[in-house]
Amino acid sequence: MNFGAFILPNGKLKHEIMFWKGLVESNYPDQFYTKHLPHLTLLNIKVRDINLALKKTMKTINDYNSFHIRIEKKGVFWNDFGTHGGHTLFYEVKKNQYILNLQKVLAESLTSEVIRRKASIYKEDYEMDLSYKKYGSPFIGEQWIPHFSVASLNKQKNNPVIIKFLEKSINFRFDVMKITFWKIKKNNHFFLDSIDLR
């Protein structure tokens, strides 16, 4: 079972993400991520004990301050290996040192709890391989692209929904006031707890 730490979007961004999720679902039912709640994943790691992971991470960021994020562009992870080659539509968060440090601190608090595969599947990418071996996730560090996913379409790259998604420019900004924690079982997310940032 996996343990997740998420940032949830504010009202306007959440509304837009839900619009696109609905559009994808109505045109192409059962695509990856369509039915997931809108969120930015700080961590998604397989752990030995969910409750201990929750306790450790909440203690680690108990004194963290709230921070500002900007979402100024959309993108696509083409041929996303995490969705068996689907094209994942996302809203990219402008990377800043604060969110990178927050992710790293959370990941480091769980290194003793992580369950890793015996052999890494990320050997072709040095940074991802190193991250997986240390943290149990390939996306901890500078190679991580903070984002809010919409859906992953198993369709052609020139699909009209993908083209339409990329056309419109965006500009969202909001203060992150809370981190939420989740138990993740395949496509299901079960809320565990949250912590308010100062």
Go through each PLM region and give its residues.
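Basic, often amphipathic N-terminal segments
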Residues: M1-I71, V76-N79, N96-D175, F190-R198
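Short histidine-centered catalytic/ligand-binding loop motif
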Residues: T88-K95
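Acidic/polar active-site rim loop that often engages polyanionic ligands
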Residues: T83-H87
